[in-house]
Amino acid sequence: MIKIIYIYLLIIFFNCASQAPPQGGPRDIEGPILLGIQPNNKSNISMDNPIVLSFDEYIDPSSIVNSVYIYPSIDVSIRVRQNKIVIKPLNKWPVDSPVEINLSRNISDYRTNKI
């Protein structure tokens, strides 16, 4: 009889905490939000300084392809570093003309939420 009670208590004891993966948090349904640009808009910069776009979450590097447009058209290197897009001219930025950078809405985070 004591063995039965002992076995019953062991079964109850080991079944108290149900084993399951953690629930996680709420599902990410918001796209990345542009937080800032360095250097500031309409500022004079060195001819070879990069332009850095900062977002509130990590950017999927594969979403950048054909999503950043630069006018006038110049050769640039575009890299993604965590939550930043770094645009650096391969030669130099144009001397006496403004540079316009347009972002397409195809830029997304790792959950494919677009900006």
Spans of model-derived segments:
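Sec-dependent N-terminal signal peptides
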Residues: 4-13
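Acidic, low-complexity Ser/Thr/Gly/Pro-rich repeat segments typical of extracellular/periplasmic
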Residues: 16-115
